[in-house]
Amino acid sequence: MKKIYTIAIALLVAATSFAQSGHRYSQVYSFNWQSSVPLGKPAEFIPSMGFNGANFNFGFFVTDNIAIGADFSWGYNQQTVDPEVYNIGDNCAVYAALYKTTQNIPMKAQFKYLFNPTGFVKVYAAAGLGATSYTEYIQIQEYQFSDSSWGFLMSPEVGIYVPFGKHSHWGANVAAGYNWATNKAQNLYFNVGLFFSVF
């Protein structure tokens, strides 16, 4: 936890240090690898952190500070349970390993606020509203069962844009957020990837 605070403070100091040395953005697009920590219903099914995710995000700036856009993610997690005897219906039982899989697809409109629009390293906070699709799969040999649901989604996020050079359109994007959904498909997520900006 101490290390996380140290990194966060260092990033904020860096953003302040470059306060007037960056370009204003008119558009920004990011492409990220996403990892997530399941909460609520997903954590009851598979409690471990998932590392198989992707994210695409874009925003159009209506002022120097404010962008309106959208965010799309896909997350996949899997767990293998050691072999044991399972009852698959009347008079039918199998001894096999059990494979659990979850798939989460959040889609949201997003409002983004840049705290330092002319800074070199740009720090932002965002809020999203939308919907999420969540599916749980269980497979035992050739038998497969699934449970799917849709839910209304609310999602706060914080992040930074770090360009590869003073006049570079490309850079690194790091973000963290929380997905809350009415179908109880909650998770904490972490994005690491690339962004492309239009000045």
Predicted feature locations:
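Cleavable N-terminal export/targeting peptides
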Residues: 1-26
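Short glycine/proline- and aromatic-enriched beta-strand/turn motifs that initiate or cap beta-hairpins
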Residues: 20-68, 187-189, 195-199
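Gram-negative (and chloroplast) outer-membrane scaffold detector with strong preference
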Residues: 29, 37, 57-140, 162-168, ...
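Transmembrane beta-strand segments that form the barrel wall of outer-membrane beta-barrel proteins
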Residues: 29-48, 129-132, 170-182
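Extracellular loop and loop/strand-boundary signature of outer-membrane beta-barrel proteins
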Residues: 40-44, 92-99, 140-147, 177-181
